[in-house]
Amino acid sequence: MQQAQQKPFIPTIPAYQALKLDEDLINKCNYSIEQLMEIAGTAVAQATTHYIESTSSVSKAGVLVVCGPGNNGGDGLVAARHLSSGSMSSATVRVWLPKEPSSSVNKRMLSIAKHAGVVFIKDTNEEALHAILEFINSCESFYLVDAIFGFSFHGGPIKPPYDTVINTLLQMQTSMAIGPKTRIVSVDVPSGWSVDAQEWGLNTDKELIPDGLLRPDALISLTVPKNCSLWLPPGTAHYLGGNFLTPLLAMEYDVQEIQHYWSGVSSLFVVLS
C-alpha cells in the first residue's frame, strides 16, 4: 500500500466541529450515512491489518471488535466484516455486541455482517465474558478494536451495559495473564475519553492519561483527528482513515494540511505516526 510522506503538522478539531463536519458531509456533499460508514469501516479494517502486520503475524492474531450503540459501532461492524475476509481471513475475528443496535443503519450493517459469516458474542453476562476469555486464551496475539464511543461522547459516567464493557477492557489491559499479548486499537476516539480532553488541562504532561481510562496502542482517526489525539503517549501508532474532505470543506475548517497526507495514496488510510 502506498502511504503519504510524513508531514510535521497534524491539524485536529474539537467535538462540535466534528459533529458539524459530519453533517456537512451529508448535507453539503450528499454522502449518505451508509456510504460514510462503509468507507470508514473499510479504512479501519485496512489500518488495523497494517498495524497487526507491523506488530505480529496475521495467522497468529485474534481480533475482537467491540461495537457500541452509535455510528462508531456501525463503523466497527463494517470493519469486522472486512477483517473476516481478504488478507485478514487467516486471522480469527469475533465481534462483541453488548447490546443490539437501535438505529436503522446499524441494524442493516449488523444484518450484512451476519450474512457475511461474522461470528458474534452478545450481551455482557457471565456466559459472554467467559466466551471472550476463551477466545483470548486461544490466540497467540490479541487485538481489540475499540469501536464503542465516538466523538459524540463528552465524558462523564458511562451507562450500562457499556460501563461493564469499559471495565472489562481495562481489566484486560492490566491483567498479568492477558495484558502482555493485548493491543488496543481505538476507532476515532479512545472510548471513555473526553473528545476535547479539556478537563486534563492544556499545559499538563500529555503522557499522564488519567487513571481509569483506556490506553490505546493505536488510534485510527477518521476524516480529521480529534483534539484528544494530542494526548496520545509517544509510541502510540496513529492512522488516518476516510478521505472525505473536499477542498472547500478543508478550507472552511482550516485543516488543509490533511489533504497533503492523501497525496499519492491509493489505500483508504495513511500512517500519521
Swiss-Prot record:
<dbReference type="InterPro" id="IPR004443">
    <property type="entry name" value="YjeF_N_dom"/>
</dbReference>
<dbReference type="InterPro" id="IPR036652">
    <property type="entry name" value="YjeF_N_dom_sf"/>
</dbReference>
<keyword id="KW-0479">Metal-binding</keyword>
<feature type="binding site">
    <location>
        <position position="188"/>
    </location>
    <ligand>
        <name>(6S)-NADPHX</name>
    </ligand>
</feature>
<comment type="similarity">
    <text>Belongs to the NnrE/AIBP family.</text>
</comment>
<dbReference type="InterPro" id="IPR032976">
    <property type="entry name" value="YJEFN_prot_NAXE-like"/>
</dbReference>
<keyword id="KW-0520">NAD</keyword>
<keyword id="KW-0547">Nucleotide-binding</keyword>
<dbReference type="GO" id="GO:0000166">
    <property type="term" value="F:nucleotide binding"/>
</dbReference>
<feature type="binding site">
    <location>
        <position position="146"/>
    </location>
    <ligand>
        <name>K(+)</name>
    </ligand>
</feature>
<feature type="binding site">
    <location>
        <position position="191"/>
    </location>
    <ligand>
        <name>K(+)</name>
    </ligand>
</feature>
<keyword id="KW-0413">Isomerase</keyword>
<feature type="binding site">
    <location>
        <begin position="71"/>
        <end position="75"/>
    </location>
    <ligand>
        <name>(6S)-NADPHX</name>
    </ligand>
</feature>
<dbReference type="Pfam" id="PF03853">
    <property type="entry name" value="YjeF_N"/>
</dbReference>
<feature type="domain" description="YjeF N-terminal">
    <location>
        <begin position="18"/>
        <end position="257"/>
    </location>
</feature>
<comment type="function">
    <text>Catalyzes the epimerization of the S- and R-forms of NAD(P)HX, a damaged form of NAD(P)H that is a result of enzymatic or heat-dependent hydration. This is a prerequisite for the S-specific NAD(P)H-hydrate dehydratase to allow the repair of both epimers of NAD(P)HX.</text>
</comment>
<feature type="binding site">
    <location>
        <begin position="150"/>
        <end position="157"/>
    </location>
    <ligand>
        <name>(6S)-NADPHX</name>
    </ligand>
</feature>
<keyword id="KW-0630">Potassium</keyword>
<keyword id="KW-0521">NADP</keyword>
<dbReference type="GO" id="GO:0052856">
    <property type="term" value="F:NAD(P)HX epimerase activity"/>
</dbReference>
<feature type="binding site">
    <location>
        <position position="162"/>
    </location>
    <ligand>
        <name>(6S)-NADPHX</name>
    </ligand>
</feature>
<dbReference type="GO" id="GO:0046872">
    <property type="term" value="F:metal ion binding"/>
</dbReference>
<protein>
    <recommendedName>
        <fullName>NAD(P)H-hydrate epimerase</fullName>
        <ecNumber>5.1.99.6</ecNumber>
    </recommendedName>
</protein>
<feature type="binding site">
    <location>
        <position position="72"/>
    </location>
    <ligand>
        <name>K(+)</name>
    </ligand>
</feature>
